[in-house]
């Protein structure tokens, strides 16, 4: 009987950890959006002030996403490179696997216009994208805080229910 109680406790703890793991995708989404947002200003400086070619400006980025797009660019537009990276990286375990549709849509709109117009239009594009990514990042932060507790609690509750059934 004591062994069953110990096993029931372990089962409850494992279910709580499973709930916490499910919430990890929300933290990854928040991290990817925050990183992309932080990388916009340095990219703008490299493109508009240092006047680096788009591919070089992207490849020099500290952000993994922008760097991947830059590496995929030879012979392609920024949008084509983004689409190629998105297809590869949205698969399970990829850099973008935790992004929501609206996150990908905002990034696609950014890459669709990146490097396609004059400096003034590019400044407006960077400002618009920074605002949109900031909003999405704030939503991801709020969602992460709320749902991490929820998923952990649901996992613990499920584990407790299974433990009761096991004992």
Positions of PLM-derived features:
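Membrane-interface, cytosolic juxtamembrane amphipathic helix immediately N-terminal to a transmembrane helix
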Residues: 101, 112-157
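Charged, amphipathic alpha-helical oligomerization/scaffolding segments
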Residues: 35, 42, 106, 125-128, ...
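Juxtamembrane/interface alpha-helical elements of multi-pass membrane proteins
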Residues: 2-75
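Residue-level recognition of alpha-helical structural elements
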Residues: 29-32, 54, 78, 103, ...
